[in-house]
Amino acid sequence: MTHVKLAIIGSGPAGYTAAIYASRALLTPILFEGFFSGIAGGQLMTTTEVENFPGFPQGVLGHQLMENMKMQAQRFGTQVIAKDITSVDFSVRPFVLKSGEDTFTCDACIIATGASAKRLSIPGAGDNEFWQKGVTACAVCDGASPIFRDRDLFVIGGGDSALEEAMFLTRYGKRVFVVHRRDTLRASKAMVNKAQANEKIVFLWNSEVVKILGDSLVRSIDIFNNVEKTTVTMEAAGVFFAIGHQPNTAFLGGQLSLDENGYIITEKGSSRTSVPGVFAAGDVQDKYYRQAITSAGSGCMAALDAERFLEK
Protein backbone atom coordinates (compact mmCIF):
# COMPACT_ATOMS: atom_id res chain seq x y z
CA MET A 1 0.00 0.00 0.00
CA THR A 2 1.37 3.39 -1.03
CA HIS A 3 0.63 6.57 0.93
CA VAL A 4 1.03 10.13 -0.37
CA LYS A 5 0.03 13.56 0.82
CA LEU A 6 -1.88 14.37 -2.37
CA ALA A 7 -3.35 12.20 -5.10
CA ILE A 8 -4.61 13.64 -8.38
CA ILE A 9 -7.08 11.47 -10.28
CA GLY A 10 -7.13 12.31 -13.97
CA SER A 11 -4.92 14.21 -16.37
CA GLY A 12 -5.63 16.83 -19.02
CA PRO A 13 -5.14 20.57 -18.41
CA ALA A 14 -6.76 20.41 -14.96
CA GLY A 15 -4.87 17.41 -13.63
CA TYR A 16 -1.49 18.36 -15.04
CA THR A 17 -1.77 21.98 -13.89
CA ALA A 18 -2.75 20.83 -10.41
CA ALA A 19 0.29 18.56 -10.45
CA ILE A 20 2.61 21.39 -11.52
CA TYR A 21 1.47 23.64 -8.69
CA ALA A 22 1.35 20.86 -6.10
CA SER A 23 4.80 19.52 -6.92
CA ARG A 24 6.32 23.01 -6.83
CA ALA A 25 4.77 23.34 -3.36
CA LEU A 26 6.71 20.18 -2.39
CA LEU A 27 3.56 18.10 -1.88
CA THR A 28 5.14 15.26 -3.94
CA PRO A 29 1.82 14.39 -5.62
CA ILE A 30 0.98 11.20 -7.43
CA LEU A 31 -1.11 11.59 -10.58
CA PHE A 32 -3.22 8.79 -12.05
CA GLU A 33 -3.52 9.56 -15.76
CA GLY A 34 -6.46 7.26 -16.29
CA PHE A 35 -8.42 6.74 -19.47
CA PHE A 36 -11.71 8.25 -18.33
CA SER A 37 -12.09 10.30 -21.53
CA GLY A 38 -10.90 7.43 -23.70
CA ILE A 39 -7.26 8.48 -23.65
CA ALA A 40 -4.73 9.60 -21.06
CA GLY A 41 -4.27 13.35 -21.23
CA GLY A 42 -7.94 14.15 -21.68
CA GLN A 43 -9.94 15.51 -24.59
CA LEU A 44 -7.14 17.72 -25.91
CA MET A 45 -5.27 14.56 -26.91
CA THR A 46 -7.86 14.20 -29.68
CA THR A 47 -7.87 17.87 -30.66
CA THR A 48 -5.80 18.97 -33.64
CA GLU A 49 -4.72 22.59 -33.37
CA VAL A 50 -5.45 24.66 -30.28
CA GLU A 51 -5.52 28.33 -31.27
CA ASN A 52 -6.87 29.94 -28.11
CA PHE A 53 -4.44 28.79 -25.41
CA PRO A 54 -2.37 31.81 -24.27
CA GLY A 55 1.31 31.83 -25.12
CA PHE A 56 1.06 30.08 -28.50
CA PRO A 57 0.54 32.80 -31.13
CA GLN A 58 0.81 30.27 -33.95
CA GLY A 59 -1.34 27.69 -32.18
CA VAL A 60 -0.27 24.36 -30.73
CA LEU A 61 -1.29 20.75 -31.32
CA GLY A 62 -3.50 19.44 -28.53
CA HIS A 63 -1.41 16.37 -27.82
CA GLN A 64 1.78 18.45 -27.77
CA LEU A 65 0.28 20.88 -25.26
CA MET A 66 -0.67 17.98 -23.00
CA GLU A 67 2.74 16.35 -23.34
CA ASN A 68 4.39 19.66 -22.42
CA MET A 69 2.21 19.96 -19.30
CA LYS A 70 2.97 16.38 -18.32
CA MET A 71 6.72 16.88 -18.66
CA GLN A 72 6.52 20.10 -16.67
CA ALA A 73 4.69 18.32 -13.84
CA GLN A 74 7.24 15.50 -13.85
CA ARG A 75 10.11 17.98 -13.86
CA PHE A 76 8.98 19.26 -10.46
CA GLY A 77 8.58 15.79 -8.99
CA THR A 78 5.09 14.54 -9.85
CA GLN A 79 4.89 10.76 -10.07
CA VAL A 80 2.67 9.89 -13.04
CA ILE A 81 1.00 6.49 -13.07
CA ALA A 82 -0.81 5.23 -16.18
CA LYS A 83 -3.70 3.65 -14.29
CA ASP A 84 -7.38 4.26 -13.64
CA ILE A 85 -8.75 4.66 -10.14
CA THR A 86 -11.76 2.36 -10.08
CA SER A 87 -13.16 3.15 -6.63
CA VAL A 88 -12.59 5.47 -3.70
CA ASP A 89 -13.44 5.58 -0.01
CA PHE A 90 -13.70 9.11 1.31
CA SER A 91 -15.38 8.03 4.56
CA VAL A 92 -12.05 7.18 6.19
CA ARG A 93 -8.82 9.07 6.88
CA PRO A 94 -6.54 8.81 5.05
CA PHE A 95 -8.64 8.42 1.91
CA VAL A 96 -8.43 5.06 0.15
CA LEU A 97 -8.08 4.76 -3.63
CA LYS A 98 -8.34 1.46 -5.51
CA SER A 99 -6.84 0.65 -8.89
CA GLY A 100 -7.56 -2.97 -9.63
CA GLU A 101 -5.71 -4.92 -6.94
CA ASP A 102 -3.54 -1.94 -5.99
CA THR A 103 -4.42 0.27 -3.03
CA PHE A 104 -3.26 3.83 -2.41
CA THR A 105 -3.97 6.20 0.47
CA CYS A 106 -3.76 9.98 0.55
CA ASP A 107 -4.43 12.89 2.88
CA ALA A 108 -6.01 15.02 0.15
CA CYS A 109 -7.38 14.25 -3.30
CA ILE A 110 -8.05 16.23 -6.47
CA ILE A 111 -10.60 14.85 -8.94
CA ALA A 112 -9.83 15.87 -12.53
CA THR A 113 -11.40 13.04 -14.51
CA GLY A 114 -13.08 15.22 -17.12
CA ALA A 115 -16.06 14.24 -19.23
CA SER A 116 -16.56 11.67 -22.00
CA ALA A 117 -18.32 11.99 -25.33
CA LYS A 118 -21.97 10.95 -25.37
CA ARG A 119 -23.34 8.40 -27.83
CA LEU A 120 -26.83 8.08 -29.24
CA SER A 121 -28.76 4.86 -28.69
CA ILE A 122 -29.91 4.31 -32.25
CA PRO A 123 -30.09 1.05 -34.23
CA GLY A 124 -26.70 0.26 -35.69
CA ALA A 125 -24.63 2.37 -33.28
CA GLY A 126 -24.10 -0.23 -30.57
CA ASP A 127 -20.88 -1.92 -29.53
CA ASN A 128 -21.92 -5.14 -31.26
CA GLU A 129 -23.12 -3.35 -34.39
CA PHE A 130 -21.16 -0.66 -36.24
CA TRP A 131 -19.34 1.01 -33.35
CA GLN A 132 -15.73 1.44 -34.50
CA LYS A 133 -16.78 0.04 -37.88
CA GLY A 134 -17.70 3.45 -39.22
CA VAL A 135 -19.41 4.84 -36.11
CA THR A 136 -17.25 6.81 -33.68
CA ALA A 137 -17.21 9.80 -31.36
CA CYS A 138 -13.78 11.11 -32.28
CA ALA A 139 -13.07 12.46 -35.75
CA VAL A 140 -9.48 13.32 -34.89
CA CYS A 141 -8.83 9.79 -33.61
CA ASP A 142 -10.42 7.94 -36.50
CA GLY A 143 -11.00 10.35 -39.38
CA ALA A 144 -7.83 9.46 -41.27
CA SER A 145 -8.88 5.80 -41.57
CA PRO A 146 -8.93 4.53 -45.17
CA ILE A 147 -12.60 3.58 -44.82
CA PHE A 148 -13.50 7.28 -44.73
CA ARG A 149 -11.34 8.48 -47.62
CA ASP A 150 -13.31 10.26 -50.38
CA ARG A 151 -16.61 9.09 -48.93
CA ASP A 152 -19.69 10.83 -47.55
CA LEU A 153 -19.37 11.36 -43.80
CA PHE A 154 -21.94 12.52 -41.24
CA VAL A 155 -21.42 14.47 -38.03
CA ILE A 156 -24.28 14.55 -35.52
CA GLY A 157 -24.45 17.69 -33.39
CA GLY A 158 -24.76 21.45 -33.45
CA GLY A 159 -22.09 22.85 -31.14
CA ASP A 160 -18.51 24.01 -31.62
CA SER A 161 -17.16 20.48 -31.27
CA ALA A 162 -19.46 19.22 -34.03
CA LEU A 163 -18.31 21.90 -36.45
CA GLU A 164 -14.67 21.42 -35.50
CA GLU A 165 -15.00 17.71 -36.22
CA ALA A 166 -16.78 18.42 -39.51
CA MET A 167 -14.03 20.77 -40.65
CA PHE A 168 -11.37 18.26 -39.70
CA LEU A 169 -13.14 15.53 -41.67
CA THR A 170 -13.14 17.64 -44.85
CA ARG A 171 -9.47 16.68 -45.14
CA TYR A 172 -10.51 13.12 -45.87
CA GLY A 173 -14.16 12.85 -46.88
CA LYS A 174 -15.78 13.72 -50.19
CA ARG A 175 -18.56 15.60 -48.40
CA VAL A 176 -19.29 16.11 -44.72
CA PHE A 177 -22.91 16.43 -43.63
CA VAL A 178 -23.72 18.08 -40.32
CA VAL A 179 -26.96 16.57 -39.04
CA HIS A 180 -28.80 18.78 -36.56
CA ARG A 181 -32.26 18.27 -35.12
CA ARG A 182 -33.02 22.01 -35.10
CA ASP A 183 -32.73 24.81 -37.65
CA THR A 184 -30.15 26.81 -35.70
CA LEU A 185 -26.78 25.89 -34.21
CA ARG A 186 -25.47 26.28 -30.68
CA ALA A 187 -21.97 26.86 -31.97
CA SER A 188 -20.20 30.21 -31.76
CA LYS A 189 -20.64 32.65 -34.63
CA ALA A 190 -16.98 32.41 -35.56
CA MET A 191 -17.18 28.63 -35.83
CA VAL A 192 -20.45 28.75 -37.79
CA ASN A 193 -19.02 31.23 -40.29
CA LYS A 194 -15.93 29.11 -40.75
CA ALA A 195 -17.94 25.95 -41.35
CA GLN A 196 -20.43 27.59 -43.72
CA ALA A 197 -17.54 28.92 -45.79
CA ASN A 198 -16.26 25.37 -46.34
CA GLU A 199 -17.70 24.10 -49.61
CA LYS A 200 -17.38 20.47 -48.54
CA ILE A 201 -19.71 20.90 -45.54
CA VAL A 202 -23.47 20.45 -46.00
CA PHE A 203 -26.01 21.17 -43.25
CA LEU A 204 -29.06 18.94 -42.80
CA TRP A 205 -31.48 20.96 -40.67
CA ASN A 206 -34.31 19.57 -38.54
CA SER A 207 -32.86 16.12 -39.12
CA GLU A 208 -32.06 13.06 -37.03
CA VAL A 209 -30.17 9.86 -37.82
CA VAL A 210 -32.60 7.09 -36.92
CA LYS A 211 -30.80 4.01 -38.24
CA ILE A 212 -27.32 3.00 -39.35
CA LEU A 213 -27.01 0.21 -41.90
CA GLY A 214 -24.22 -1.78 -43.53
CA ASP A 215 -22.49 -5.13 -43.78
CA SER A 216 -19.08 -5.38 -42.13
CA LEU A 217 -18.87 -1.57 -42.25
CA VAL A 218 -21.31 1.34 -42.34
CA ARG A 219 -22.82 1.74 -45.81
CA SER A 220 -25.86 3.98 -45.35
CA ILE A 221 -28.02 5.79 -42.81
CA ASP A 222 -31.70 6.64 -42.49
CA ILE A 223 -32.36 10.32 -41.77
CA PHE A 224 -35.70 11.57 -40.45
CA ASN A 225 -36.79 15.16 -41.08
CA ASN A 226 -38.79 16.14 -38.01
CA VAL A 227 -40.57 19.01 -39.80
CA GLU A 228 -41.53 17.32 -43.06
CA LYS A 229 -41.99 13.96 -41.29
CA THR A 230 -40.10 12.14 -44.02
CA THR A 231 -37.27 9.61 -43.96
CA VAL A 232 -34.55 9.27 -46.58
CA THR A 233 -31.68 6.83 -46.94
CA MET A 234 -28.27 8.25 -47.77
CA GLU A 235 -25.00 6.53 -48.56
CA ALA A 236 -22.53 6.91 -45.71
CA ALA A 237 -19.14 5.57 -44.73
CA GLY A 238 -18.90 7.23 -41.35
CA VAL A 239 -21.08 8.58 -38.55
CA PHE A 240 -19.43 10.79 -35.93
CA PHE A 241 -21.20 11.68 -32.68
CA ALA A 242 -20.54 15.21 -31.40
CA ILE A 243 -23.45 15.69 -29.00
CA GLY A 244 -21.90 16.62 -25.72
CA HIS A 245 -20.21 14.93 -22.81
CA GLN A 246 -20.91 12.95 -19.66
CA PRO A 247 -18.85 13.79 -16.56
CA ASN A 248 -16.71 10.86 -15.41
CA THR A 249 -17.95 10.55 -11.84
CA ALA A 250 -19.40 7.03 -11.67
CA PHE A 251 -16.30 5.66 -9.89
CA LEU A 252 -17.01 7.98 -6.95
CA GLY A 253 -19.91 5.80 -5.87
CA GLY A 254 -22.08 8.73 -4.83
CA GLN A 255 -19.65 9.89 -2.13
CA LEU A 256 -19.55 13.47 -3.41
CA SER A 257 -22.46 15.80 -4.07
CA LEU A 258 -23.30 15.91 -7.78
CA ASP A 259 -25.73 18.05 -9.75
CA GLU A 260 -28.59 16.66 -11.85
CA ASN A 261 -26.22 16.00 -14.76
CA GLY A 262 -23.58 14.21 -12.72
CA TYR A 263 -21.09 17.07 -12.42
CA ILE A 264 -19.29 17.48 -9.09
CA ILE A 265 -20.63 20.40 -7.08
CA THR A 266 -17.93 22.72 -5.76
CA GLU A 267 -18.23 25.63 -3.36
CA LYS A 268 -18.54 28.98 -5.11
CA GLY A 269 -15.14 30.53 -5.69
CA SER A 270 -13.21 27.40 -4.76
CA SER A 271 -12.55 23.80 -5.75
CA ARG A 272 -13.82 22.36 -2.46
CA THR A 273 -16.36 19.55 -2.71
CA SER A 274 -18.84 18.20 -0.17
CA VAL A 275 -16.05 16.19 1.49
CA PRO A 276 -13.29 18.19 3.24
CA GLY A 277 -9.94 17.37 1.67
CA VAL A 278 -11.43 16.40 -1.69
CA PHE A 279 -11.23 18.95 -4.49
CA ALA A 280 -12.45 18.98 -8.09
CA ALA A 281 -11.06 20.67 -11.20
CA GLY A 282 -11.73 20.80 -14.91
CA ASP A 283 -14.69 19.57 -16.91
CA VAL A 284 -15.77 17.11 -14.21
CA GLN A 285 -17.15 20.12 -12.32
CA ASP A 286 -17.63 22.64 -15.16
CA LYS A 287 -20.60 22.34 -17.50
CA TYR A 288 -20.54 25.97 -18.60
CA TYR A 289 -17.11 26.97 -19.91
CA ARG A 290 -15.36 23.67 -20.65
CA GLN A 291 -12.24 25.28 -22.10
CA ALA A 292 -8.62 24.18 -21.77
CA ILE A 293 -7.64 27.46 -20.14
CA THR A 294 -10.46 27.36 -17.58
CA SER A 295 -9.64 23.74 -16.80
CA ALA A 296 -6.02 24.67 -16.23
CA GLY A 297 -7.08 27.57 -14.02
CA SER A 298 -9.30 25.35 -11.92
CA GLY A 299 -6.43 22.86 -11.61
CA CYS A 300 -4.33 25.66 -10.14
CA MET A 301 -7.17 26.51 -7.73
CA ALA A 302 -7.45 22.88 -6.63
CA ALA A 303 -3.73 22.60 -5.93
CA LEU A 304 -3.73 25.81 -3.89
CA ASP A 305 -6.83 24.71 -1.98
CA ALA A 306 -5.25 21.31 -1.30
CA GLU A 307 -2.03 22.94 -0.11
CA ARG A 308 -3.94 25.12 2.37
CA PHE A 309 -5.92 22.11 3.56
CA LEU A 310 -2.78 20.07 4.17
CA GLU A 311 -1.18 22.92 6.11
CA LYS A 312 -3.94 22.86 8.72
From Swiss-Prot:
Question: Which Gene Ontology cellular component annotation is one that this UniProt entry carries?
Answer: cytoplasm
Q: Name one GO biological process term.
A: removal of superoxide radicals
Is the keyword Iron assigned to this protein? no
Cofactor: binding comment: Binds 1 FAD per subunit.
Got any disulfides in this one, which pairs?
Answer: 138-141
User: Mind telling me which SUPFAM superfamilies this protein's record contains?
Assistant: FAD/NAD(P)-binding domain
Q: Which residues bind FAD?
A: 33-43, 283-292
The record's listing under Pfam families reads: Pyr_redox_2
What cofactor is this protein dependent on?
Answer: FAD
Q: Where in the cell is it found?
A: Cytoplasm
Reaction catalyzed: [thioredoxin]-dithiol + NADP(+) = [thioredoxin]-disulfide + NADPH + H(+)
Matching entries from PROSITE patterns are given as: PYRIDINE_REDOX_2 (PS00573)
Q: Which GO terms describe its molecular function?
A: thioredoxin-disulfide reductase (NADPH) activity
Alphabetical UniProt keywords = Cytoplasm, Disulfide bond, FAD, Flavoprotein, NADP, Oxidoreductase, Redox-active center
Judged by the first EC level, this protein's enzyme class is oxidoreductase
UniProt EC number:
1.8.1.9
Coiled coil: which residue ranges? Answer: none
Name the family: Belongs to the class-II pyridine nucleotide-disulfide oxidoreductase family.
**Entry's PANTHER family?**
THIOREDOXIN REDUCTASE 1-RELATED-RELATED
| Miscellaneous comment in the UniProt entry for this protein | The active site is a redox-active disulfide bond.
This protein's assembly is summarised as: Homodimer.
Q: What name does the UniProt record give this protein?
A: Thioredoxin reductase
Q: Which gene encodes it?
A: trxB
